[in-house]
């Protein structure tokens, strides 16, 4: 995440639960725990990651792994597996190959795509508590969003990787994500770009003006927070023993 989960402290609505699509190796787990969020649904398409994820989730009773690729329909697709793991995608490389010449697809594997709404209906009675959705699935984000209209009505926030060029062939662009999420009252309030044609965006339903100001001044806010962060670290590390 280009914007750390725990830098989202402006959030007026409490994050009760998270749906994280594109689990990979649970890199965001420590940040979620630090933010006191224990209810997390992880979705991952790559079967090679399942044993690692399940082993890591054993001590968390309120976290579960969904073993499928989030999409608009129940279908079978080929997942392209990359040599760095994180660039694996259901789509072929576009400008990604030019931007990251050392990254290649090394194999393919057949996976199922499912609409998130259908899977949640089959497996959860308390899906209303999952009001934060995080998507990082390498250009396939819009297809995944189209499979979760019911959950988007519930969500207060969507954090998503976005593209400004065809990083993956046929991938959704920022304007496409903006237009689609607007149907559910979700407006883009923050954006962080890289120089590689992609970035991260945060969408919210409430306090839009305040949220936009917050993200505009986030670099300054981080500097202001730094002494307090170091103070808390010192207290926890050396005093509370």
Where are these regions (language model features)?
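Phosphate/nucleotide-binding beta-alpha loop and adjacent structural elements of enzyme active sites
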Residues: 1-241
